[in-house]
Amino acid sequence: MAPTPPPKQKGKLTLAQLAAYDDIVTDALVDRAFFWTKIRKNRPKYFAVRGVVEDDVTSILLHDVIVAKDVIKAEKSLLNLSGLRKYVETLKSDKEKEWFRRHLRKYIAIYLPDCPFEVTTTNRYTITTHEAALSARKFIRTGDTIKHLSGTLVAITPEEEKTLDLTRRDFSIVMSSRKKTPSLFLGPARFSNHDCNPNARLVTKGSEGMEIVAIRDISIGEEITVSYGENYFGVDNCECLCHTCELSLSNGWSPGGPPEHDSRASTPETTEHQEKSSSGSEKRKSPPESPSHPSEDMPSKRPKFENILNLRLEISPPSSPDPIAEPLITVNGGLRALRSHFASLAGKSDLRHFQKPHSNFISASSSSDQTSCSLCPDDEAPTSTRSTSATSISDSNVQVKTEPTVEQQPRASSETAPKTISGDHGLHVQDIIRDNDESDLSDLSASWEINDREMTAVKREPVKKKKRKRKSSIIPTIEHEAPKARTPGDYTKTPKLLAQRYDRWVDCQTCNAWFVQGDAYLTRKECPRCERHSKLYGYRWPKTDREGRNDTEERVMDHRTIHRFLRTEDEARVQRRGRGVSHATSPTPDVSENKTETDASEFGDERRLTRSLRRARSSLRLAI
């Protein structure tokens, strides 16, 4: 009998699939259920699903989940929404669709009236941003498994772990004590934060499930916390900012704060920077020096050519009668070197006799050798309004001419006779340069100029150069500021969260917690957490359903019928001085502290009076 083949391994839920499911469900069932902020998504480039409207979601949660307590019916109603329906259609297999429905049911169950917790936020960790948290709305006994607080575990491969180290955005990675492998857990249980003295612990259920069990009594309004590990926030959790560390002034809440980083290595030396900058400026300002081109003979200004493309150089060796065309001569190339060399030689020999150097003075391309150049005589070279007189050299025939597009004019006879120099290496100089205002080639050098009347070169008077004094300046450096030491309670009643003029801290009339109300022209009664609870369940927080037969309070089915602001007489008792900011911080809010919200002195004497006092004054005026 042939052995039976091994059973095929069932497909497992991957990390990418679970992260996508969790982003879709939290966007639909948390962010669009009267939530005052956005839950962090696993994918950084997540876009909200279209076709999911907040009114439709909250209506399904109220009628199907809270009142009817039918999770299956609510699941079907939610999947009929256009946004979720289109997403389910994109899933390839039936198994993937079942995984998504299973994950959706976990989030639907947290809205059941018997659920002992709810999703809220806290700004204890970052002050300016709110992180998700879990708050108990029912008393939880020690050893009880917190109902509906579960999650899904997925093992992380080494490749995925490397990617998550760079892109992960929250603390959803746990180390399994049984498998000794890192795993990502998502679901409602992911919102439980860390505490060094937690009131609950994570327990695995099956191969892919996770639950949270209370290890001590959890009272109403207390945050549900677990332990992430001993070294999760640094060595011995030295950077932990949990509530226990806040009360004990330890770890991240220690008065000393984090150590400051030494910034001397990142700060450049001032003198070295100045020397580099001065040397760089000198290199830019001064021309390059060479043995054949002294620095004092170089022109002070760089000549500019308007028609530089029309200027060409043709070089032919003495043995061949036909000239060979060469590339264009640039301003910094042959012509400038030729003019500079003539000026230096003319200065040494007083424009009468000078000897040609044996070294070449025109730099050609890297592939060709350097060669001596000469200009044609006056009667052979055509001129134009853009050209100057040329200088001829007997060793080689070098012509500077313009393109036919330039208008040419007959050249006038030269007033000065050409100067000749005898010798094998002698040079015949016919004309040094002519005065032409339209061309910058008329400049011999910085030390010579042309006499207009005699048409001769005259040495210029030396010009005194002003030495610029080097100014010492402070070099600004970009350094990262060391994180400031945290103080207990610095995230409550702080001015850092009052961005607008009318923002202020307000005391909740239900849970006695301080919250920031934006544009607080009228003071709200409840904080966002209590107001959201009232809109969803129709009762005041933390009540979710009738408490026995004798409870006659009716559930409010339409939240729009509830007035969410203080009454006139209650508003009159509120002091607006200080905008609710407290300078003496404490880890727990002081309930007995007077509610001081907006400084009335900023708006004048007229706004110091509340509306009730204005009405009383107007009634007195009418009576009189």
Curated annotation (Swiss-Prot):
Q: Reaction catalysed by this chain?
A: L-lysyl(20)-[histone H4] + 3 S-adenosyl-L-methionine = N(6),N(6),N(6)-trimethyl-L-lysyl(20)-[histone H4] + 3 S-adenosyl-L-homocysteine + 3 H(+)
Which PROSITE patterns does the UniProt entry name for this protein? SAM_MT43_SUVAR420_1, SET
Region span, Disordered? 253-302, 362-425, 459-490, 573-609
Bias type Polar residues, positions: 397-419
Q: Which CDD domains match?
A: SET_Suv4-20-like
Q: Which family does it belong to?
A: Belongs to the class V-like SAM-binding methyltransferase superfamily. Histone-lysine methyltransferase family. Suvar4-20 subfamily.
Tell me, in a sentence or two, what this protein's role is: Histone methyltransferase that trimethylates 'Lys-20' of histone H4 to form H4K20me3.
Q: What is the name listed in the Swiss-Prot or TrEMBL entry for this protein?
A: Histone-lysine N-methyltransferase SET9
